[in-house]
Amino acid sequence: MAEYKNYTLNFGPVHPAAHGVLRLILELDGENVVRADPHVGLLHRGTEKLAEFKPYNQSIGYMDRLDYVSMMCNEHAYVMAIEKLLQLEVPERAKYIRVMFAEMTRILNHLLWVAACGIDLGAMTVFLYAFRVREDLFDCYEAVSGARMHAAYFRPGGVARDLPTQMPQYQKTRFTSKRKAKKLNEPRQGSMLDFLDHFVVDFEKSLDEIDTLLTDNRLWKQRTVDIGTVTAERAKELGFTGPMLRGSGVAWDLRKTQPYEVYHKLEFDIPIGANGDCYDRYLVRMAEMRESNKLIKQCVDWLRANPGPVLSDNHKVAPPKRNAMKNNMEELIHHFKLFSEGYCTTEGEVYVGTEHPKGEFGVYIKSDGANKPYRLKMRAPGFAHISAMDELLSGHMLADTPAIISTIDVVFGDVDR
């Protein structure tokens, strides 16, 4: 009689634009996963070491490229760590702008997640709905920085510039008719704050559409309910954070438990799951988008009523005004030295953790008093989640593997660094 043996299957890696360069070596008993061995490091770019050879203000651009779908949230933790080292005060208006863009980034991340997860499980329509909404938020990125993704907008001491009084306009092209461009430009006639007033109303309707497509969909629930279950206690032991932890029923969110910036002045709830499965993680992220929408609305209302500076007046870290730089040699020299040599910080070490869309993103900086960090270490939320891959996949069918990987929501830019 023939002897039956388990066999090994290489799952991935795929292109970074797909699910990322994860290589899983699966041991299968028929269609059942017996063991999963994740291999990481295929997108390692040496970001931490690169940052140790550059002045503090020249490494902000690297942060955007860590988790490249949550760009400004990466910048946020980094600039807050520098501010903590320098004991730098940030203007109140800049704090509200940062929080507003951090919540926009959370929505961008979760929309991409639900779009990709939908495709993995056969729901193509969700992808189209989600990307339609993401375009509006990318327009906001473009309006403040000129870039649709890698903005480098957050700066130590505040943000690069105040909110614009006009939004980018669509133009007639061979792909966009004059009539369509006019319709798209209707909410873009005023300032960014006017545009966001329109957005928060329309976004609720867009979320309702996605909700209708997925939440009670029989096939969606069959693919996600009781799949990849993690208990609350086990999630804490594994070092889960973010929606992975809250999906298991643990109400841990750094915006509430360790408030930073102006989150303590804003009203929002922490959505949690009950069962810790893929379906609960989906529900948590959907609810988080609604909470982020509320936070954006509160920030818009405050910013409209409270004009003011958006960058610290500490000339050690803040560049001169552009007009002054063009008319005054001393200001030009100041600008040149600031962006070529940077600035020195006090000796010491700091850690700053922020509530990233994927979990706790942390930046640890050890300074020896120079103009560049002696050591820079980043805590990627996805690393702990990938480390639990064997436990999450074991006992499930091979067809459940894409569902579990999707609901982890891992991007290897920050895991591999």
Curated annotation (Swiss-Prot):
Q: Which reaction does it catalyse?
A: a quinone + NADH + 5 H(+)(in) = a quinol + NAD(+) + 4 H(+)(out)
- An example molecular function term from Gene Ontology annotations: NAD binding
Q: Name one Pfam family in it.
A: Complex1_49kDa
What InterPro entries does UniProt report for this protein, alphabetically?
A: NADH_Q_OxRdtase_suD (IPR001135), NADH_UbQ_OxRdtase_49kDa_CS (IPR014029), NDH1_su_D/H (IPR022885), NiFe-Hase_large (IPR029014)
Fetch the Gene3D superfamilies from UniProt. Cytochrome-c3 Hydrogenase, chain B (1.10.645.10)
Tell me which PROSITE patterns the record gives: COMPLEX1_49K
Tell whether Translocase is among the UniProt keywords. yes
Q: What is its EC number?
A: 7.1.1.-
An annotated GO cellular component of this protein is:
plasma membrane
**Which HAMAP family does the protein's record reference?**
NDH1_NuoD
Would you identify the family this protein belongs to, as annotated?
A: Belongs to the complex I 49 kDa subunit family.
Role = NDH-1 shuttles electrons from NADH, via FMN and iron-sulfur (Fe-S) centers, to quinones in the respiratory chain. The immediate electron acceptor for the enzyme in this species is believed to be ubiquinone. Couples the redox reaction to proton translocation (for every two electrons transferred, four hydrogen ions are translocated across the cytoplasmic membrane), and thus conserves the redox energy in a proton gradient.
Q: What is this protein called?
A: NADH-quinone oxidoreductase subunit D
Gene that this polypeptide is encoded by: nuoD
